[in-house]
Structure formats: structure tokens, C-alpha cells
Amino acid sequence: MELVIGLLVILLALFAAGYFFRKKIYTEIDRLESWKIEILNRSIVEEMSKIKHLKMTGETEEFFERWREEWDEIVTAHLPKVEELLYDAEENADKYRFKKANQVLVHIDDLLTAAESNIEGILREISDLVTSEEKSRGEIEQVRERYSKARKNLLAYSHLYGELYNSLETDLDEIWSGIKEFEEETESGNYIKARKVLLEQDRRLDQLQTYIDDVPKLLADCKQTVPNQIAKLKDGYREMTEKGYKLEHIQIEKELDTLTNQVKRAENALLEELDVDEASAILQLIDETIQSMYEQLEGEVEAGQSVLSKMPELIIAYEKLEEEKDRTKTETELVKESYQLTAGEIGRQHAFEKQLETIGRLLEQAREKLDGEHVAYSLLIEEVEAIEKQLEEAQKEHAEYRENLQALRKEELQARETLMHLRKTISDTARMLQKSNVPGIPEQVKDKLETANHHIEETVSQLEELPLNMEEAAKHLDEAEKVVEEVSEEAEDLVIQVKLIERIIQYGNRFRSQNHILSEQLKEAERLFYAYSYNEAYEMAADAVEKAAPGAVKKIKADQSAS
């Protein structure tokens, strides 16, 4: 029983597979059949009828015959063959010869693809032929008009073209021959070939029109404009040389000879080769070179004006600075009698004198070159501007040095004024301590007071010396200011602290009779207080009172700050 069921299952599976493959093949057969019918229904004959208005000779006749033969072959040979193969594929599918059926279908697809490609090629060639005829029919009149216009212009302005007239006329004759060739090919039915001939004449007319438009100007440039520019530049060069300008470094005469040869090259490119682009490029380069030469000459003139105006000014400024140097040197010697100058200040004076010597030497060299015959202004201006910069730096350095000399007296007066202020601060601090009834001054404060007085006395001593060493005096003065500021602040803090200790002890006295421990602590605080150990006295008193009345110390501080 199980064997029977197994066989039935296998049979059903085989039947299902066979059904699936047959259906797939039938679907492909239907697709190929539809494609075949679509090809058969293509309007090739209708498309071919579009050329009936053309002359059926030459290329057109050859094309038409070939297209008709190819279409007949598709209809009478390829498509019947496809029909036969479709029947074979269907028969193979019915007999479950699926592999054979698929091979036949692939072959059919190849045949239909080839037929489709062949048809597309025919349609494309038909379109090209018809389009060529239509475009040429529309463009030939434009070409004739352009030809006529070019010939009229050439005849009307023949005198502008000189030796090129015959060459340009020959080109026009060749274009006319090309137009005639176009007409002959069109009459012979060779529309595609005629199209190529027409496009070539159109291109040649474009080129010829460029020649007609550009050649007169280029010839005028070669024969008149550029030679005149070269002559004018040569005259300007000669005139500047006669006025004393040194222009050997520019080498204009040699360059102008080269430009003259370049003009001949441009003219030859036009007359012998009819190469407008080459001639234009050469003339453009010549124009750029001429402009560059003018810029160099103008630069030489500007440099000359600048040199001739700056040199007298620099000489005057140098001589004035020399006079100031002598006065400053005398002033420096006078200052040295009263003040000790630092090594840096003395070095600045020596450096300034050397710098001035260098500037004088450079000025003399520049003056010699200016009086000579072989140095161009454009080269000399760089040296003059460098001297000008050095002179400005020397003037600035000298002014700063003079200011430093004058500042020494100001620094001395400022130092003496500061000393008076420091002495007053110390005196005020001592008076404040005395009025505050402080039991005594701690050793730390005494030491700082002594240190401050020491630096003050050292500063006074330095200020009394001749020559005065202001740098050393300033060091002692800075130390004195620092120490006086510290001791003044500490003295103020000391007075505040003493008053606070007294208030805390007074506040704690109310608890003495009731609290023996507090009484002993306050007694110790008083001992420390009169021993000038104010920090320890504060800690002892504050600790005792805070234990007896928490928060009392904070309140006492607040009351003291408010009073």
C-alpha cells in the first residue's frame, strides 16, 4: 500500500513539474509570437515612401534597393523561419522535450533580435537621408548668401588685403566650386555626400570670413601700427638717454631689434601661410613687450624723480642729526657728572654714533653713484630707500636716548618725593600705635620697621652720591616701599586685634566669679597680652569665652566692625 502511495506521489510531482515547464515554454512562445507579429506590422514600407520625392538615382537609388531587399528577406525568409521554429518548440514542449524546446526558443530570440536591429538600421538610414536633404535644402541659400557677401567685401576693400588678395580670392573660387559640387551631387541623388560637401564649404566660409575680418587690421599692425610704436619707443629711449638717464640695464635697443624681426615673422605668417592665429599671437606678444618696456621707462622716470627729491632731504636730515649727536654727546658728559649711566645707556650712545657713521658712508656712496654715469635710478632708489629707513631708525633711537637722559632728573625728584611719603607713612604708623595704647610692639613688626628705615636711609645715601646711580637707588626705594606697605598693614591689623582681645576679656569678666576655669584662662590670656603675644592671647581668650557663651566671639567681632 505504501509503495502504491509513493508511486502516486512521484507521478503527481512529475506531472506538476511537467505542467510548470510546459507553461513556462508556452509563455515564451506567446511572447516571441507577439514580437514576430509586431515586426511584421512595422511600417517600413510607409517609412520608405518618405524618399519618393527625392531623385531616385545615385545613393538614394542604392539605399532604396538595399532597404527593399533587406525588408523582403525579413518578411519572406526570417519571419517564416521563426514561425516554423515556434511550431517545433511547441511540439517539443508537448512531448516533454524541454531542453530541446528551450534551445529552439533561444535561436528564435536571436533571429528576431537580428531582424529588429536590421529594421532599426534601415529606419536610421532613411532618417539620415531625409534629414540631410531637408537641412541642405534650407542651408544652401544661406551659404550662397554668405559667399556673395564675402566676395563683395573682398572686392570692395581689395586694397586692404595687399598681397593676400589673390590667395583669398582663390579660396572663394574653391568654395564656389564646392557649392557647384553640392548641386551636382544633389542632382545625382547623392544627398548624404552632398551634405558633407555643403558642411565643408560652410566651415571654409567661416574661416575665410575670419580672414576677411582680421587680415586688414593685422596687416596694418604689421606695416604701420607696430613699427610706429617701436619707432616711438626708440625715440623716447633716445630722449631719456640724452637727459642723463642710465638705461643700459634695460637693453631696449637690442630688444627693439628683436621686436622688429618678430613683426616680420607675423607678416610672413599672414602673407605666406595665411595663418591668422600665429600672426595674432606674435603681435600680442609684441604688444605686451612694448607695454613692459614703457613701464620700465616710466619706472625709471619715477625712480629718478624720487632719488633726486629724496637725496637732498636725506643729506639735510643727516647733517641735522650729526649736529644733534654733538649736542647730545656734550649733554651726556654733563649728565655723567651728576648721574651714573648704565652700561646699556652708554652702549646705546656708542651704537647710535656708529649707526650715524654708517649712514654717512652710505650717503656718500649714493651721492658718488648719482654723480657717476653707469647707475640707473631704478637700481639706486633701493639704496636711497634703505638709507632713508636707517636714518628714521637712528632719529627714533636718538630721541629715545635723549628722553632717557631727561628722565634721570625726573626719576630723582620722584624718588625724593616717594621717600617723603614713606617717612610720613612710618611716622603715621608709629603715632597710630602710640595712640591705640598697645601694650607693646611685637618683634616681627619692629624688625620690619627697622628694615624699612634701613632701605630708606640707603636710598637717601644713594641719592646723595655723585655721580648718582639711579638704578641702585631705585632698587632700595622699591624694597623700602614694599616693607613700609607691609608694616603699615600689620600695624593696622595689630591695633584691631588688640581692641578685639580687650573686648573679649571684658566680656568674659562677667563669668569669672562663676567659672573658675574661665577665670584662669582669662588670666593666662592677659599675661600673654602684656607679653605682646597677641595671637596666643586672642586664641586663649576667645576659646574661654566661647565655651562659656557660645556665639559670643562672633557677636563681639560684629559689634567692633560696626563701631
Curated annotation (Swiss-Prot):
Annotated InterPro entries: EzrA (IPR010379)
UniProt GO BP: division septum assembly; septin ring assembly
Entry's localization field: Cell membrane
Coiled coil: 133-159, 243-276, 309-529
Identification of the protein by name: Septation ring formation regulator EzrA
Family statement: Belongs to the EzrA family.
Topology, Extracellular side: 1-2
GO CC terms of this entry: plasma membrane; septin ring
Cytoplasmic side: 22-563
Transmembrane parts of this sequence: 3-21
A UniProt-annotated Pfam family: EzrA
Matches recorded under HAMAP family: EzrA (MF_00728)
Keyword Cell membrane: yes
Chief localization: membrane
